[in-house]
Amino acid sequence: MDSVIRFSVSLPSQLLDELDRKVSEQGYASRSEFTRDLIREKIVNDSWKDADEELIGVLTLIYVHHHNDLVNKKMDIEHDSDVKIICTNHVHVDHHNCLETISIRGEASKIERFADRIAGLKGVKFSKLTKAAVPKF
């Protein structure tokens, strides 16, 4: 691990109070650890702007599995896509609804296109792409 460098940040008192509340609520050991996580999150989000870099993501879906041919259309998109599907997890929420997570690796633009195609299928009630990347620091 690199050496740690201390620096200071000036904040309005209300923002500092909110920071301390978040640090406490979320169980962080310190303001520094909370701030490091925020910086990492910003760097990961910005890395998604570089469409050529290989990244990872998780697509979370809730859909009605009885809907006309939805499962087959979803599988066709998965098999025909140019992203790597690492893992899927399927949960039967109730008699009609399924929760599915799809872990994906590929270029940012291809992952987003894949997620958009599946989200646009009739019968998909909820779709959220969680963007991730392994920080290089």
Curated annotation (Swiss-Prot):
GO process annotations (BP): response to nickel cation
Residues involved in Ni(2+) binding: H79, H90, H92, C98
SUPFAM superfamilies referenced in this protein's UniProt entry, alphabetically: ACT-like, Ribbon-helix-helix
Keyword Ribosomal protein: no
Cofactor: Ni(2+)
Function according to Swiss-Prot or TrEMBL: Transcriptional regulator.
Protein name per Swiss-Prot or TrEMBL: Putative nickel-responsive regulator
